């Protein structure tokens, strides 16, 4: 199995896990947050619905796109259903870009603005959405436990 195929598999599974976690929350709690400085499950899903498009551009062009309209784009995904559909579509497009990524470019490096600036290999970049999905899955599961639901969904 190629590295890219494994990343696609992990990414698709991570998206399914996040969607299942949000679906398990009571509908009236999907936009609930435990504190003013916290993020709701819906807000996190808004990010996950739009972020793959940035990663596609990064993979295709080798540089990070501008985030000029990021907040407005997130806010335009104002329902769970829209976020879920958009996340699936955008992640599908990202998985296409990952699976088509050439082996000989896996060690290429790119500078990213995250964490004050960092350099990552393209192999690491291919896995960023899967990592981000898993990160938010944990946050959503924590919200679930704060609401008294201790089941693994």
Where are these regions (language model features)?
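Short acidic-aromatic active-site loops that bind/stabilize oxyanions
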Residues: 7-8, 84
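Short, contiguous alpha-helical
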Residues: 8-12, 16-19, 27-72, 112-153
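Flexible, active-site-adjacent loop/turn segments at secondary-structure boundaries
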Residues: 23, 30, 104, 108
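Short, solvent-exposed, charged loop/turn and helix-capping segments
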Residues: 25-28, 99
């Amino acid at each position: 199995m190629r590295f890219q195929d494994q990343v696609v598999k992990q990414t698709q599974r991570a998206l399914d896990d996040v969607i299942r976690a949000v679906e398990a929350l009571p509908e009236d709690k999907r936009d609930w947050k435990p504190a003013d400085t916290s993020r709701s499950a819906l807000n996190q899903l808004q990010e996950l619905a739009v972020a793959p498009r940035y990663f596609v551009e990064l993979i295709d062009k080798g540089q990070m796109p501008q985030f000029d309209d990021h907040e407005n784009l997130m806010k335009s995904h104002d329902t769970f259903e829209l976020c879920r559909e958009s996340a699936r579509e955008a992640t599908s497009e990202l998985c296409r870009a990952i699976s088509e990524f050439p082996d000989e470019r896996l060690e290429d490096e790119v500078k990213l603005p995250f964490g004050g600036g960092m350099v990552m290999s393209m192999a690491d970049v291919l896995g960023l959405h899967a990592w981000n999905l898993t990160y938010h899955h944990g946050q959503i599961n924590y919200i679930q436990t704060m609401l008294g639901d201790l089941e693994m969904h």
